[in-house]
């Protein structure tokens, strides 16, 4: 028909229009320097993929038709009906594709961040008890007193400064403390394990957080200069460490160096490693030394509270994902109502030829589910691309830290189930509307025949 030919030309034009968008996205990808640049690339990729969707649906539907034998005439009829539904469902399916892609990409980003944060906390908070910096006699507590429950301790010190126009923190650490020894460095010089703790090397080796690398634009092995009491000191960066959630530049130096070169050095609290089974004994000892229970916290409590805060923070993301899916479902419902209202006279012809309502439902449901399936399958690799961009590009440009991408099929399966429920609900509403209006269409068909 003329309508089908026009729609076929439109699909071909959309496919060809996607090619320059893909090419432009590829060209801009290698020039991403800001968050805006990253979102421009994402927009180009998503819209280009959406333009390819109608042709993809047509291709898959044609393959299904070619594989069905002529004896399965009902299935062939149902598959052919997709060509009648696609012109008016095209925009709604493109919106559904973008919704599913965003849902998969953002969910993967959040899960990757949570996994990275949890693993980082396992090492960063490896001590059993953390005493607040406000405790008056913290210096005496840091000294090993021969207690049988104490395995190790780590008293961090710190001083606030500025580096390249932004707030920075220089922390003094005990290089032999368990959390420093076990600290994972995503990037380091080959000989960084010992030299960074040396006091005799000039320039002094130093560790920096990833924000220094990605936001401060400093490479491994380069020299940075930090000011103290009007004097500039040079340090060579021998490694970068993860530092999730902080907006500051952070540097690690041995505690002796920090105390020698900076004034007003403050305590950053005390970490205590306790022998297995002796946690209660350790807490009782702290109470006997005049430290109230509110002035220290257990490792497990810190981790639990940290992850609870994380989960509450990103609950809004899950709510927005659900909202966008509902909006896409409403758009699909509106498109379905429009297409089936327009085809009521055609359905009246089917009914007069002996097609039952159940057969009608199968004939119109099969192509819709097929089109939604193609949309969902295309959303999976597109969602992976989105999550890859968010994790390895936008996250680094915006916050300055890196993390591995953690892909899980469980959220994808859950999203697929919810999508099927939304589509079936829309189909059910449309079926009720058609069933209610079909008798009127039959009467009109009978009147035309008189």
Feature names for model-found ranges:
Residues 36-44, 117, 288-327, 339-341, ...:
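Peri-transmembrane interface segments
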Residues 86-111, 311-348, 358, 369-383, ...:
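Hydrophobic alpha-helical transmembrane segments of multi-pass inner-membrane transport and secretion
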Residues 1-97, 101-109, 414-429:
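Alpha-helical transmembrane segments, especially those used as permease/efflux helices
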């Amino acid at each position: 028909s003329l309508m089908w030919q026009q729609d076929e030309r439109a699909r071909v034009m959309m496919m060809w229009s996607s090619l320059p968008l893909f090419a432009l996205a590829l060209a801009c990808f290698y020039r991403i320097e800001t968050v805006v640049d990253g979102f421009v690339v994402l927009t180009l990729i998503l819209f280009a993929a959406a333009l390819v969707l109608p042709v993809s649906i047509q291709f898959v539907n044609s393959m299904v038709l070619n594989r069905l034998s002529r004896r399965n005439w009902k299935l062939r009829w149902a598959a052919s009906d997709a060509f009648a539904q696609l012109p008016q469902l095209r925009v709604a399916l493109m919106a559904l594709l973008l919704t599913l892609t965003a849902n998969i990409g953002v969910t993967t980003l959040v899960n990757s961040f949570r996994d990275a944060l949890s693993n980082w906390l396992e090492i960063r908070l490896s001590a059993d008890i953390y005493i607040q910096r406000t405790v008056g006699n913290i210096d005496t507590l840091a000294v090993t007193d021969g207690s049988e429950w104490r395995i190790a301790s780590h008293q961090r010190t710190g001083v606030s400064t500025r580096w390249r126009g932004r707030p920075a923190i220089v922390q003094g650490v005990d290089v032999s403390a368990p959390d420093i020894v076990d600290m994972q460095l995503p990037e380091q010089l080959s000989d960084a394990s010992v030299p960074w703790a040396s006091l005799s090397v000039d320039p002094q080796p130093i560790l920096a957080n990833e924000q220094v690398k990605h936001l401060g634009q400093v490479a491994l092995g380069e020299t940075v200069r930090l000011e103290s009491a009007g004097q500039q000191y040079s340090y060579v960066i021998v490694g970068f460490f993860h530092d999730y959630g902080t907006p500051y530049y952070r540097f690690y130096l041995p505690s002796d160096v920090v105390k020698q070169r900076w004034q007003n050095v403050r305590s950053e609290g005390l970490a205590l490693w306790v022998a297995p089974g002796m946690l209660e004994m350790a807490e009782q000892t702290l109470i006997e030394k005049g430290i109230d229970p509110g002035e220290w916290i257990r490792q497990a409590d810190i981790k639990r509270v940290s992850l609870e805060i994380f989960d509450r923070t990103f609950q809004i993301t899950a709510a927005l994902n659900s909202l966008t899916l509902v909006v896409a479902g409403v758009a699909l419902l509106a498109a379905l109502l429009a297409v089936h209202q327009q085809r009521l006279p055609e359905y009246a012809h089917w009914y007069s030829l002996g097609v039952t309502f159940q057969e009608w439902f199968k004939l119109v449901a099969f192509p819709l589910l097929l089109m939604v399936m193609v949309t969902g399958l295309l959303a999976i690799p597109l969602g992976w691309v989105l999550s890859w961009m968010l994790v390895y590009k936008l996250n680094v440009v915006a916050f300055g830290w890196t993390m591995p991408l953690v892909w899980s099929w469980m959220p994808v399966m859950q999203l697929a189930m919810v999508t099927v429920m939304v589509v079936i609900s829309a189909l059910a509403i449309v079926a009720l509307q058609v069933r209610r209006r079909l008798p009127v269409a039959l009467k009109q068909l009978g009147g035309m025949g008189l």
